[in-house]
Structures are given as structure tokens and as C-alpha cells.
Amino acid sequence: MGSEMCIRDSMIAKRGVKIDAVYFHAPPYTSERAKQKVVDLARLVAKYSGPIRLHVVNFTDIQLYIYDQCPHDELTIIMRRYMMRIAEHFAKKDRCLGLITGESIGQVASQTLQSLASTNEVCTLPVYRPVIGFDKEEIVRISRKIDTFETSIQPFEDCCTIFVAKHPVTKPNLKVIRRSEQKLSEKIDELMETALNTTEIIEIQ
């Protein structure tokens, strides 16, 4: 969770939308300090949004399995597709009406229009992106305004960056991505089930 996520949540909250959040934790690659940073940011956002239910998903085994089975230039896209599947599971379970993400177009390889379309494909709920047109300067300015900037820049690990390829695909071909996911077989379903069943829920006031 960084500046984009805090801005995303505060923008949606000011329209009266209740927020449930999902954080993907990958111990031992991401530390307890990284998790605490997310909790601290959620508390800051809760000042604007009201109570937040934070789902902490242990994503390590899923990430490692994808890393072992899939082409490395596709890792980020495939991991994010599984993150979206998990987020949608909790959204439907809690009767939410959509998913909200913090991407802005083109800032990183996973946020090109082609990449966003690839992650959207696995969801049946609508995906909203409140900061999609913001540049980095706008994001920093707003995060300072809502008092989340200093916490968001704490240099702790992020599960989206620990298995990044040197040259990640920026224009994923959906047929190729689907074919790579087929290699994951039933094992990925078992890992997903375990991750869902062991998710920690933290009520943020």
C-alpha cells in the first residue's frame, strides 16, 4: 500500500463508499514492518473513510509457484491476475459491488493499458481506478495533503516488487497469458484455497 492506494481510498470514501481492503503479504520476503506500514496507512485513511476491514493474504506460496512455472517476463501480470481473483473473492463474499485499484496509466510495466486490460479480464465485478490519470507529482501533492506521504515512502518490501523480471512484458497477449496460466494446473487452485482460508482480518478504526 502506497500513496496511490491512500489517495484511491480517500477519493472513493468522500463519495460515501465503505471500504474493505486487501493486502498481499509474502513472508519472509516481506517483513512484519511492511505489514505494519499497511496497517498504519489504513488507520490514516480511516480518518476519512470510517472503519476499514483489512484482509491480509499470505501470497508467498502462490508467488513462488508462479515464479517456478511461468515465463519470468510474465510474472507481474500473472501474479496481479491472481491478486485480482482473490480480491474479487472477498468482494463477493462481503457483497461489495466493485473493486478499486490504485493504478495510474503507464507508471510501471503492469500499468499500461494492455496490462490493465489483462488484469481486468479475470474479474466479473467492475474495476474502478480513481487515480488513473494522475501523474507522480499530483499523487505526491495529494498524499501530502491527506497526511499519508511520509508513511507511504517508508522503504519496506512490497510483494509486487520482490519477483520482478528485468524486462517485464508491457503489452501482454491475452492468449499467451492464458496459456501460461494453464501450466499452473490444479496446484494453483489448492494454493489459492489455502491463502483464502488463512487470511487474517484486521478491523481498522
Enumerate the language-model features and the residues they cover.
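Short, small-residue-biased leader/transition segments that mark boundaries at the very start
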Residues: G2-I7
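Phosphate-binding active sites in nucleotide-utilizing proteins
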Residues: R8-A26, T30-K37
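Generic beta-strand/beta-sheet core signal
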Residues: V22-F24, V57-T60, T101-G102, P130, ...
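A conserved beta-strand->alpha-helix junction
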Residues: L41-D68, D158
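Active-site adenylate/phosphate-handling loop in enzymes that bind or generate adenylated species
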Residues: Q63, Q69-R141, K145-I146, L191-E203
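A short alpha-helix-loop-beta-strand transition element characteristic
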Residues: D147-P155
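The feature marks non-catalytic terminal segments
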Residues: Q154-Q205
